[in-house]
Each structure stands twice: as structure tokens, then as C-alpha cells.
Amino acid sequence: MLQVYNTLTRNKETFKPLKEGEVSIYACGPTVYNMPHIGNYRTFLLADTVVRTLQYLGYKVKLVMNITDIDDKTIRDSKAAGMSLKDFTDKYSAEFFKGLDMLNIKRASAYPRATENVDGMIELAQKLIEKGLAYEKGGSVYYRISGFPDYGKLSKLDFDSIRIGASVDVDEYDKDNPRDFALLKASAPEEIERSIYYESPWGKIRPGWHIECSVMAMNSFGPTLDVHIGGVDLIFPHHENEIAQSEGATGIPFVRHWIHGEHLIVEGEKMSKSKGNVFTLPEIVEMYGGEVVRFMFLSVHYRKKLDYSETFAENAKNNYLKLKETLDNLEFALKNVEDEPGPGDLETLKTLPELENRFREALEDDFNTPKAITVFRELSRTANVYLETGKNMQVLEEIHALYKRFSDTLGIFAKAGGEEVPGEVVRLVEEREEARKIKDWKTSDAIREKIKSLGYIVQDTKEGPKIKKSEES
């Protein structure tokens, strides 16, 4: 039974969606004003991990991830770049999607944009004013946090010293010292000049950051959703404010399960431009490959800080390559096996369900991917032991099927077994075999090097030559 740590209660809870067998998930997506760094993608990968796990457990899942394409940062940086807000945010939205593909992150069911949902934000602000939970001031609309007694229930911060009635326009304000926050902001003259405004009962406005997610989540799922995902940095003020807005308007719980991923740090320190330790995803992928980066993220539980370093990344790469080599060996054996029964067949078949039970139990324990990877490595060892002597087609097929279930659930080896070896490489391997038969080792070695230059390597096995793509290519 799936147990999920709920930030709201600070406890692991038995997961129960509103509708049996179906799960609604809203995840905070990118603010598209620059290249997302690797910490952002750790959170996006968390959403993908939750989706894949739930699907593995038999749930039908709908994930919605927003794109914040209008806020303080996008307006500021688009102006600095000399671009329209739309052209600027479209550019970085495209970069965001490229990053998802690099990490083999499944597409969400929808990616609503803030600019496409402003009418709903104006309606929500009107409703909150009618309930006495919001007020207009200077053409902006603010949330009155003193009117919502449950304010602070998610972040568990001490709000005894809240300054009642003080209001701020910034999207990100001082931690531990909240103010009435802006739902809708009066557009500044320079924003109006750039056509960054929407007509409202209070004049020309543009949305604040927090109201965007409340509206997009409720537009997608109604007043209550099963799961809301984001980074720990969003607990306060962003998610606290989402609760205040949504529950203030509807009077019913907004989210059943809050899931928050921890920070990614670099060699023990928080990423910052001043320290020069901010890495974008393309930079890291260029060094290690997308699947290795994904595997690296999965090797640390989402509620623990991930301390990125070159040593840590290299260790993840080595473990990933060992698992991939086993898959390559399995697929090679399936194509070349003689299909003979052996003494280890029954014992191996008996082991597989036990391993799958442990894999499932790991993921049911609050999406414990490091523990699931440990079980995956045990399956790899089991497979390699069998491959030394076993030749039973049924056993090999069952090992391979379980291996693929594990890898698909973790989202790795997406391209394994699907790439055709170029005809030129196949021809060179055949020529090399002819040279080896007559013990012409010089020619054999020369052909091996030529094959390597084409991005492939040859492994000589007792079943014959095995071709695989070089990890360096």
C-alpha cells in the first residue's frame, strides 16, 4: 500500500485519491525567464517519478504542470533583452521542453500558461473581495491574510508578529514576515507601454505569481486535487498563499497530499551566481548524458538534499553503465540463445517475483527510488549469474521483461535495444571475424579501431561478437 509523506501533516500517510484508481496532480512548473538550472529539473523529475510510480501501481494519472510566463522576473528580463514578453517567454519555454526530453521526462497532460488564464484570476479576486478576504488599494488587489485563520498551516511558521494590513507588491517577500500579498497588480506605466496589462474592474492589471497557480490548478481539476508537487522553497510563501486563495474562495480543502522535493546543492553549498556554481541542465548533460543525470537524481531520495559533485556524478555513471551492460547482455542472449533447459532455471524463476515485490515495496515507501535502485542492481546480478550458464528462452524472457518493467518505471534505458547498428559497422565486424579465424590479429585490431571510430565497440564472447554503441560517442 502506497505511503506518501504529506508536508501538510508532516507524516507519511496511506495514499487515497478522491476517485478510486484515478489521480489528479498539479506540479509547479518553470518561470520561463532564463535557462532552468539542475535544481529546477530535480523537481520536474520528482513529478515524473510520482507519475511513473502511480502508473506502475495501476493508477490512471493526469498531471498538469503550469508555465509562469508573466511575473516580476519575466517582465524585468524581457525588457532587458529588448524582446516582447511573449517572444521572450516562448524562447525559454522551448528550452524547458528540450530539458524534459534530455531527462526522458514524460509530457504532462497539459501545460497551461498564466497568460491564458487571467480571466479566471480576475474572477477569483472578485470572489475573495466579496468574501472579505481581499481588497483593492491603488489599483491592485491584495489578499487579507488576517481574514484566513488557517494561514500558515502548511509552512508551520510562527505568524504571531504578522503586520496586519501591510501590503507588498513583490512576488517573493521576506520569509517569516509575511504581508498581505498581491493577487492582481496595477500595471506600471512602462508595462502598459509594452502592452503588458489586462482590463479589470480595478483598471489595467497583471496577475501576481500566487494567484496564477490557484486558478490553473482549479481550472484543471476543480476545487480539490489529490497531489500538489513543488520544491521545498515554494512551501512559503507560494504554496501557503495558494491554500489561502483557493480555500478562502471555496471553503473546502484545496489539496489532499502536498509533496515537496529538497534542494540540490553543489559540493555542500547552495547554488549561486556569485560562487560560480550554478549549472544548467545542458551543461551537465553534455558531461554525463541525460540518462546518467536522471539516474543520479533518482539515486537520492527526493526529501534529502542532493549534493552534486564530480565524484558523485561519476559514481552514478558507473552504476548506470553496469545496469545498462546487463540489459545489453540480456538482449544479445535473447537473439543468440540455443534454448536449452538448465539446472538454475527454476531457482532463477523463483527469485524474480521476490525481487519485484521488493521493488514495488520500495516505491510504495514514499517513492523511495534509491531503495528501488538497490533492488534493480540485485536483479542485474541475478541476470548476470544466469547468463554465465543459462540458456532457457523462457527464463531469459522473464528476466528481460522484469528488467524492462524496472527500467520503464524509473525512466531509464528509453532507447535501449531500439537502435539499428549501421550496415557499415556490421560489415566491418564480419570482416574482423574472418581475420580472427585465420589469426590475422593485426588486421583484426585495425578493424576494431575503425569500428570504434564509428562510435561502436566489439566485445568478443563465446557466442560470437557483440556490437554495442560506445558511451563516448
UniProtKB/Swiss-Prot annotation:
InterPro entries in the cross-refs: Cys-tRNA-ligase (IPR015803), Cys-tRNA-synt_Ia_DALR (IPR015273), Cys-tRNA/MSH_ligase (IPR024909), CysS_C (IPR056411), Rossmann-like_a/b/a_fold (IPR014729), tRNA-synt_1_cat_dom (IPR032678), tRNAsynth_Ia_anticodon-bd (IPR009080)
Cell location: Cytoplasm
Family: Belongs to the class-I aminoacyl-tRNA synthetase family.
Catalytic activity: tRNA(Cys) + L-cysteine + ATP = L-cysteinyl-tRNA(Cys) + AMP + diphosphate
UniProt name for this protein: Cysteine--tRNA ligase
Pfam families: CysS_C, DALR_2, tRNA-synt_1e
Intrachain S-S bonds: none
EC annotation from Swiss-Prot or TrEMBL: 6.1.1.16
Cofactor-binding details, from the entry: Binds 1 zinc ion per subunit.
Organism of provenance: Methanosarcina mazei (strain ATCC BAA-159 / DSM 3647 / Goe1 / Go1 / JCM 11833 / OCM 88) (Methanosarcina frisia)
